[in-house]
Amino acid sequence: MKELVNILDFLPEELGEKIKPMFRVKQIYQWIYQKYANNFSDMSSLPKDLRLELAQNFHFSPVKCVKNEQSKDGSIKYLFELIDGLRVESVLLPMKEEKIDTEGKRISHARYTICVSSQVGCKSSCSFCLTAKGGLKRNLSAGEIVGQILWIKKQNNIPYERRVNIVYMGMGEPLDNLKNVSKAVKILAQNDGLAISPRRQTISTSGLAKQIKELGQMNLGVLLAISLHAVNDELRTELMPINKAYNIAAIMDAVREFPIDQRKRVMFEYLLIDGINDKLEHAKELVKLLNGIKAKVNLILFNPHEGSLYKRPSLENAIKFQDLLSSKGVTCTIRESKGLDISAACGQLKERAKEQ
């Protein structure tokens, strides 16, 4: 039996090499990403013989949802099974956004962020992260990354044109899978597809300096987030062994070279761990470290998980840390940890084995 190819892996120009004429590719993209077709036979504007040809050569179901859990805060965690049986998790984070209409009335509507995985597992071995405990199984293809987003939007009846933010902060180190992640960014940005601007896509990294430079040279227009979590190499190496390969100085050099929109900032994620990196002296060092960089600091309170040796700091200490940074002119927020009750928060995702 012929092995079917995942059509979500293809950019329009690549699909155009297999399907003629090109306007048919545009129609196929619209059926998949905008009309949320369930199968090729749904694509009624295509000739019957083309629909048959597509069904004989392609599929567009690279992920299958086997479980979902909804948090009391509205977040939904999805467990996806891939074609080879491996599993990844993704999270939908709905948020309310308020605006003033032309009559001066306050109106609110849903704004969505989707946190996607880029690998099955991770090899970075960060001591505070549950994902790393199982090691790295493999990279996801571009289509498997895109498939998570497409399935979540379709399942939640989110119109394709509705504004959505994508954060590559799920399972895996995105820059360790740069080829497929960068391709996913391009596929998601297609006007005949989901039309998610690169400016709404944030790639998070544990600090692979070489790949940060490579990403910058691609000029994709994406946002960059650095998982920093420590202000000196000794502590960072203890928390994040990847620091042995790319120390803080190397990361900062790469960040300074990274092209960023004038209206945007590089995000630095800083996980506050009780008694480890949450003292005011750490905050002072962080201010020095970010000098000259157009940065925004996102403080995250450690999210406990099974087997963890670390503790979550008090909100009071986090606010003191934030206040010091703000007083020195550093833009800083404390991230609200969503999905804690369903293990969907930062550092809590993992490849969950099949239930026996």
UniProtKB/Swiss-Prot annotation:
Transmembrane helix listed as a keyword: no
Cofactor: [4Fe-4S] cluster
UniProt xrefs under PROSITE patterns: RADICAL_SAM
Single Gene Ontology MF annotation: 4 iron, 4 sulfur cluster binding
Disulfide bond residue pairs: 115-346
Gene Ontology cellular component annotations, sorted alphabetically: cytoplasm
Presence of the UniProt keyword Lipid biosynthesis in the record: no
Entry's Gene Ontology BP terms: rRNA base methylation; tRNA methylation
Domain Radical SAM core: 108-341
Reaction it catalyzes: adenosine(2503) in 23S rRNA + 2 reduced [2Fe-2S]-[ferredoxin] + 2 S-adenosyl-L-methionine = 2-methyladenosine(2503) in 23S rRNA + 5'-deoxyadenosine + L-methionine + 2 oxidized [2Fe-2S]-[ferredoxin] + S-adenosyl-L-homocysteine; adenosine(37) in tRNA + 2 reduced [2Fe-2S]-[ferredoxin] + 2 S-adenosyl-L-methionine = 2-methyladenosine(37) in tRNA + 5'-deoxyadenosine + L-methionine + 2 oxidized [2Fe-2S]-[ferredoxin] + S-adenosyl-L-homocysteine
Active site annotation, chain numbering: 89 (proton acceptor), 346 (s-methylcysteine intermediate)
SMART domains assigned to the protein according to its UniProt record, in alphabetical order: Elp3
Cofactor note: Binds 1 [4Fe-4S] cluster. The cluster is coordinated with 3 cysteines and an exchangeable S-adenosyl-L-methionine.
Superkingdom field: Bacteria
Localization: Cytoplasm
InterPro entries, per database record: Aldolase_TIM (IPR013785), Elp3/MiaA/NifB-like_rSAM (IPR006638), Methyltransferase_A (IPR040072), RlmN_N (IPR048641), RNA_MTrfase_RlmN (IPR027492), rRNA_lsu_MTrfase_RlmN/Cfr (IPR004383), rSAM (IPR007197)
EC number(s) per entry: 2.1.1.192
Described purpose of this protein according to its UniProt entry: Specifically methylates position 2 of adenine 2503 in 23S rRNA and position 2 of adenine 37 in tRNAs. m2A2503 modification seems to play a crucial role in the proofreading step occurring at the peptidyl transferase center and thus would serve to optimize ribosomal fidelity.
Additional remarks: Reaction proceeds by a ping-pong mechanism involving intermediate methylation of a conserved cysteine residue.
Protein family (similarity comment): Belongs to the radical SAM superfamily. RlmN family.
Name of this chain's protein: Dual-specificity RNA methyltransferase RlmN
Source organism phylogeny: Bacteria, Pseudomonadati, Campylobacterota, Epsilonproteobacteria, Campylobacterales
Gene field: rlmN
